[in-house]
């Protein structure tokens, strides 16, 4: 591990207690890591450190099922809270984000009675991050009835009215900004360093959002490194090949020669090795082209009519119809 130009060697080994296959040569070596962790903690406690690194993992179970507005809980404002459950399986605890936001907004509203322009930097970091990634604004808690709302395209909505993809991304971004705000003493809380792992970044997202979600994450949290998994051609088509690792059967496959700028169908065929078109339709198109190449134009016309009745005027059908009309004068006579 390398942190602030310092190399650290460490390892964690887990042997079954009194296990038959316990390996005495395998043991944890955490001395260097523990020493560095203590140094970071001391620097933070003494006010010498302005930022601590975030490490957090969001798995595929991060879907937000409910917004627990009526839960009352006092949360600590410390680095310990920022790291709580950050690497646990089962998804980040988004409940804590909503509770944290409501508690801080209560404090902000108290100060605004005397100073209407007062804003909590921690909440501003969340609002800025959400606006940057989703375009939503004015995230707030309404009291009567109790609900969390935001502005989408100028319309105030309850967050429960958002799609699953919108709500999941909102909570993920809010949780990241919350954690970073507790680990940074700089004015711009979103500028903190970190390593963020997100499984299936395209989870529930509309294909249009999949296209730019990675770029928006990098712009919103510029000092964070993102390690993402995806099965989305839209996501892969927005990344340079050096940023892509292809896994198959638990093995690292050869790096792709190109990804950025490819269409979704090209990504499916070249990177994912899958068909970009329905197999039956692809076979019908091949049969039509084969008849045209053989000069069997009557048969080609029958294939064309059958295919059109099945799929309509898709671009490939129109292209082959135009070619057939040029090759077979009989089509123009019939027209």
Please describe what each predicted stretch is.
Residues 45, 215, 219-221, 234-335:
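RecA-like P-loop NTPase motor core
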Residues 32-36, 118-125, 168, 209, ...:
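Soluble or luminal CAZymes and related metallo-dependent hydrolases
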Residues 143, 147-276:
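Switch/communication elements of ASCE P-loop NTPase nucleotide-binding domains
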Residues 52-55, 81, 124, 167-170, ...:
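Non-catalytic, well-ordered alpha-helical scaffold segments
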Residues 70, 142-144, 280-284:
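Short coil/turn segments at secondary-structure boundaries
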Residues 65, 70-72, 111-112, 274-277:
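Short, polar/flexible loop-turn hinges at active-site or ligand-entry regions and domain interfaces
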Residues 1-95, 287, 292, 312-335:
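P-loop NTPase switch/coupling surface
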Residues 3, 79-169, 174-191:
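Extended helical coiled-coil dimerization/tether regions that scaffold
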């Amino acid at each position: 591990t390398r942190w602030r130009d310092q190399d650290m060697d460490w390892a964690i080994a887990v042997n079954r207690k009194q296990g038959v296959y316990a390996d005495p040569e395998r043991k944890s070596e955490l001395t260097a890591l523990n020493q560095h962790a203590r140094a970071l903690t001391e620097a933070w406690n003494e006010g010498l450190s302005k930022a601590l690194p975030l490490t957090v993992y969001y798995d595929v179970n991060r879907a937000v099922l409910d917004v627990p507005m009526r839960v009352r809980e006092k949360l600590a404002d410390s680095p310990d809270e920022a790291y709580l459950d950050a690497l646990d399986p089962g998804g980040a605890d988004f409940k804590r984000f909503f509770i944290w936001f409501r508690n801080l907004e209560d404090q902000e509203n108290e100060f605004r009675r005397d100073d209407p322009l007062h804003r909590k930097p921690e909440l501003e970091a969340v609002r800025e991050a959400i606006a940057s990634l989703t375009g939503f604004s004015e995230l707030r808690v309404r009291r009567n009835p109790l609900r969390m709302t935001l502005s989408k395209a100028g319309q105030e909505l309850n967050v429960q009215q958002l799609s699953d993809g919108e709500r999941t991304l909102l909570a993920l971004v809010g949780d990241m900004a919350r954690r970073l705000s507790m680990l940074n003493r700089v004015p711009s809380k979103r500028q903190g360093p970190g390593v963020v792992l997100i499984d299936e970044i395209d989870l529930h997202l509309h294909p249009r959002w999949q296209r730019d979600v990675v770029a928006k994450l990098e712009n919103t949290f510029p000092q964070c490194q993102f390690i993402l998994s995806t099965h989305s051609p839209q996501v892969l088509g927005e990344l340079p090949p050096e940023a892509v690792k292809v896994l198959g059967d638990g093995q690292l496959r050869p790096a792709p020669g190109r990804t950025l700028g490819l269409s979704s169908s090209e990504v499916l065929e070249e990177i994912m090795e899958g068909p970009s078109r329905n197999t039956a339709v692809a076979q019908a198109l091949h049969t039509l082209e084969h008849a045209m190449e053989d000069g069997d134009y009557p048969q080609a016309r029958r294939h064309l009519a059958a295919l059109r009745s099945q799929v309509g005027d898709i671009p490939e059908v129109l292209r082959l119809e135009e070619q057939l009309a040029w090759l077979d004068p009989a089509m123009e006579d019939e027209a």
